A protein has these predicted regions:
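Conserved ABC ATPase "signature" region
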Residues: 71, 78, 129-149, 259
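Hydrophobic anchor residue at the start of the ABC signature
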Residues: 116, 168, 179, 192, ...
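Short catalytic/signature loops enriched in Gly
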Residues: 4-5, 22, 145-149, 243-328
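P-loop NTP-binding/switch modules centered on Walker-like glycine-rich loops
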Residues: 184, 188, 192-270
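A short, proline-enriched helix->beta-strand linker immediately N-terminal to the Walker B motif
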Residues: 173-177
């Protein structure tokens, strides 16, 4: 893997002001994305995965949301200090995104041609005719049949899988350095999921040192596609490791519980193993250990002290949010 850093995220905090209080959706998160790698973020719903990705692209709606602290460095430049126009020149060109819901991500009243061409005209300065030709080529690359005809159709004339292919084509049109894929296979059947993931990996390989940030709750997808993985819960990182280290030696009790919840084909069992309790509301999370409500004191990362452990390096390149006592 290339060791040149593409994105550096330092002490990122993204909060939402609500009538019930301040929701700390992302609370002091730091990690790097390297050129050419596929970095996964996994966790339950409400763990802060999507808010992290939206923060990178500065798409947090304000109000009620706000990035209250941190740095997001792209090639050494802090994206949080850029003006709206400066960020608009990066968003969609250097950093692009595939959104979570393909059925609603496209504008229903505009033809596909109009939506795809807009990106190329804005960022690459192409004429409408040249933009249309490049858009047709991209639709062909992502497997849309008869692209020269279908480019004039409206989104409702495509299936969910085809709409996601269009979203991938749009995201990759300007050869971005970073592609953020926020649960790109949500609401798609298993066969289409596999096709979409294969397509993303094939297109990435053809683009050399471009990176992918893949957000999902599916550990099987993570295992198949990623080089490294971040496990999030409660708005903080619980573990960061290479894909090999994470599956061979998960350290955080939360990561271990996620692994245990995966059905094993070679183990006969009457019932599935599941984490006890529910994901607490972000409004209910304070500065104490986020895992206490899901684990018995002796099994928790804080060993029952309720003090939030620091993210510590447990082996080279492998970090986990556990206390020293937990590692003994």
């Amino acid at each position: 893997m290339n060791q040149e850093k593409l994105i550096q995220i330092k002490n990122l905090k993204t909060f939402f002001n609500t009538e019930a209080g301040i929701a700390k959706a992302v609370n002091d998160v730091s990690f790097d994305i390297y050129k050419g790698e596929v970095l996964g973020i996994v966790g339950e719903s409400g763990s802060g995965k999507s808010v992290t990705s939206m923060s990178i692209n500065r798409l947090i709606p304000n109000p009620p949301g706000e990035i209250v602290n941190g740095e997001i460095l792209y090639n050494g430049e802090d994206l949080l200090k850029l003006s709206y126009d400066e960020m608009s020149r990066i968003r969609g060109k250097d950093i692009s995104m595939i959104f979570q819901e393909p059925m609603t991500s496209l504008n229903p009243v505009l033809r596909v041609r109009t939506q795809m061409n807009e990106i190329l005209v804005k960022h690459d300065g192409l004429t409408e005719e040249d933009a249309t030709q490049k858009s047709i080529e991209m639709l062909d690359k992502v497997g849309i049949p008869e692209p020269s005809r279908r480019i004039n159709d409206y989104p409702h004339q495509f299936s969910g899988g085809m709409r996601q292919r269009i979203m991938i084509a749009m995201a990759l049109q300007c050869n971005p350095a970073l592609l953020i894929a926020d649960e790109p296979t949500t609401a798609l059947d298993v066969t289409i999921q596999a096709q979409i993931l294969d397509l993303m990996m094939d297109l990435k390989e053809s683009r050399g040192d471009s990176a992918i940030l893949l957000i999902t709750h599916d550990l099987a997808v993570i295992a198949e596609t990623c080089d490294r993985v971040i496990v999030m819960y409660g708005g903080v990182i619980q573990e960061i490791a290479s894909i090999f280290d994470l599956f061979k030696n998960p350290t955080s009790p939360y990561t271990k519980a996620l692994m245990d919840s995966i059905p094993k084909m070679d183990v006969k069992s009457d019932r599935l193993r599941a984490l006890k309790g529910m994901v607490p509301s972000i409004l209910e999370l304070g500065d104490e250990c986020k895992l206490c409500s899901r684990f018995d004191p002796e099994d928790c990362a804080c060993c029952g002290t309720k003090i939030e452990p620091e993210l510590a390096e447990v082996s080279p390149g492998h970090f986990a949010r556990v206390s020293k006592e937990f590692l003994v």
